[in-house]
């Protein structure tokens, strides 16, 4: 990753790291890179509910107008909503202002190309080079050649109309509990499920600019689990701040994670003959129980590095149509170009309706292996992982597991940590395996 762009756009503390000055430049230079071949290019901008969203939007808009772009403001909308509308409205680029599941003080900016996909590494590097250049030599249109800004707040409704076409059934007779994380889906989700005749109970849908992700949403599903039981709902659906993730809760208040949701959708699509190449794409963090459950259904799997962008890359490259992460980013490439919480929620409830099975039964077919993750602070993460003694103890543990468990040792992408993860039939074995490896890393490379 570059100096500004991480795995999911530019992120930082709003007004401290991600300043309006930087946002102006990102709008100007990013807009130029994405639209330089087009006269009067059209660029869409959406944002989540953070207090800093207005400030950054104003700066971004100014940067885009300064290179002659026509800007359409979508207002508060989910990240996948921006991705869909960028392509559907024939825009040259889309921009989302959000820091997803991060706390309120953070914010971020991510771009989509005209095809609705996130930018390539090459495009990001081109924008970074302009951000780092000492002089701004880009064109400065004047008079009638300057860009203009218009509001298109109906964009959210256009996106919801599209989503409704992805399911055949209405949801009458199903009681759905929603947790919108006080974020981008706060207005969208209730409308969507009510339009499909579900009985809807909603929490986490009163954004005030400061409460996004605060004890609610897909990173705090325990709040929704209690709400489901209180309301007697059939299913709970928790989104994150920008609406690109879904974590579900069954009728008993049990959490159903991204692996389980992927398994349920993969099995259903496969039975319908709609799972391309009978394959699902996941990351190395997916649970061993996920792979074993897929195998039992005759479904193949492909693994990528952690990050939904790598899942999407693999799907595009080899023509797969279902992939995702344990964290709840699920990608249905037949319908959208990025992880989409609302879309995933629709597919999941549709499967419940068609199969007439409760979520506990659908999710129960996948037996999750106990998982233990330990972070070890180190002086040199790459050296720690490559170390011969560390590799020897990893091999030793893997031999003992004999295929009935899994070890994953990887560096953190952002911190001086090595993450040691084990999956095994019991919690005790998980603890033993992780500690044996972590102890060797600590002894030799502990910070």
UniProtKB/Swiss-Prot annotation:
Q: How is the cofactor bound?
A: Binds 1 Mg(2+) ion per subunit.
What processes does the entry annotate via GO biological process terms?
Answer: carbohydrate metabolic process; peptidoglycan biosynthetic process; UDP-N-acetylglucosamine biosynthetic process
Matches recorded under InterPro entries: A-D-PHexomutase_a/b/a-I (IPR005844), A-D-PHexomutase_a/b/a-I/II/III (IPR016055), A-D-PHexomutase_a/b/a-II (IPR005845), A-D-PHexomutase_a/b/a-III (IPR005846), A-D-PHexomutase_C (IPR005843), A-D-PHexomutase_C_sf (IPR036900), A-D-PHexomutase_CS (IPR016066), Alpha-D-phosphohexomutase_SF (IPR005841)
Disulfide-bonded cysteines: none
How is the protein modified post-translationally, according to the record?
Activated by phosphorylation.
Positions of Mg(2+) binding: 100, 240, 242, 244
One Gene Ontology CC term in the entry: cytosol
Cofactors: Mg(2+)
Enzyme Commission code(s) on record: 5.4.2.10
UniProt modified residues of type Phosphoserine: 100
Entry keywords, A to Z = Isomerase, Magnesium, Metal-binding, Phosphoprotein
Catalysed reactions listed for this entry: alpha-D-glucosamine 1-phosphate = D-glucosamine 6-phosphate
GO molecular-function terms, A-Z: magnesium ion binding; phosphoglucosamine mutase activity; phosphomannomutase activity
Which catalytic residues are annotated? 100 (phosphoserine intermediate)
Q: What does this protein's UniProt record list under function? A: Catalyzes the conversion of glucosamine-6-phosphate to glucosamine-1-phosphate.
Q: Which PANTHER family match?
A: PHOSPHOGLUCOMUTASE (ALPHA-D-GLUCOSE-1,6-BISPHOSPHATE-DEPENDENT) (PTHR42946:SF1), PHOSPHOHEXOSE MUTASE (PTHR42946)
Per the record, the similarity remark reads: Belongs to the phosphohexose mutase family.
Q: What is this protein called?
A: Phosphoglucosamine mutase
């Amino acid at each position: 990753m570059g100096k500004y762009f991480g795995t999911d756009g530019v992120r930082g503390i709003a007004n401290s790291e991600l300043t309006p000055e930087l946002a102006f430049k990102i709008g100007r230079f990013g807009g130029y890179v994405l639209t330089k071949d087009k006269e009067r290019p059209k660029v869409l901008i959406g944002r989540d509910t953070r207090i800093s969203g207005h400030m950054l939007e104003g700066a971004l808009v100014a940067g885009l107008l300064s290179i002659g772009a026509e800007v359409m403001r979508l207002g508060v909308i989910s990240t996948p909503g921006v991705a869909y509308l960028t392509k559907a409205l024939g825009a040259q680029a889309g921009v989302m202002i959000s820091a997803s599941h991060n706390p309120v003080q953070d914010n971020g900016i991510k771009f989509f190309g005209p095809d609705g996909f996130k930018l390539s590494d090459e495009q990001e590097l081109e924008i970074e080079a302009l951000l780092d250049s000492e002089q701004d030599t880009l064109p400065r249109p004047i008079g009638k050649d300057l860009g203009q800004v218009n509001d298109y707040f109906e964009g959210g409704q256009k996106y919801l109309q599209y989503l409704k076409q992805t399911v055949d059934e209405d949801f009458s007779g199903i009681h759905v509990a929603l947790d919108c994380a006080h974020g981008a889906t706060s207005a969208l989700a209730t409308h969507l499920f009510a339009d499909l005749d579900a009985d809807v109970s909603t929490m986490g849908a009163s954004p005030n600019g400061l409460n996004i992700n605060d004890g609610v949403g897909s990173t705090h599903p325990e709040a929704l689990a209690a709400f489901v039981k209180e309301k007697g709902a059939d299913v709970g659906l928790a989104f994150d701040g920008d609406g690109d993730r879904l974590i579900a809760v069954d009728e008993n208040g049990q959490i159903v994670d991204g692996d389980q949701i992927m398994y349920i959708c993969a099995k259903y699509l496969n039975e319908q003959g709609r799972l391309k190449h009978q394959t699902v794409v996941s990351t190395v963090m997916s649970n061993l129980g996920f792979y074993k459950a897929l195998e039992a259904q005759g479904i193949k799997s492909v693994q990528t590095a952690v990050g939904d962008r790598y899942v999407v890359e693999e799907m595009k490259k080899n023509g797969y149509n279902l992939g995702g992460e344990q964290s709840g980013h699920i990608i249905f490439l037949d319908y959208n170009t990025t992880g989409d919480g609302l879309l995933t929620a629709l597919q999941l409830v549709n499967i419940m309706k068609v199969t007439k099975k409760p979520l506990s039964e659908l999710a129960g077919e996948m037996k999750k292996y106990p998982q233990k993750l330990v972070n070890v602070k180190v002086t040199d993460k790459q050296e720690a992982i490559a170390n011969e003694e560390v590799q020897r103890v990893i091999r030793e543990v893997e031999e003992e597991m004999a295929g009935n468990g899994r070890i994953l040792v990887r560096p953190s992408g952002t911190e001086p940590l090595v993450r040691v993860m084990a999956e095994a039939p019991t919690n005790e074995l998980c603890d033993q395996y992780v500690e044996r490896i972590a102890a060797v890393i600590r002894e030799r490379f502990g910070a």
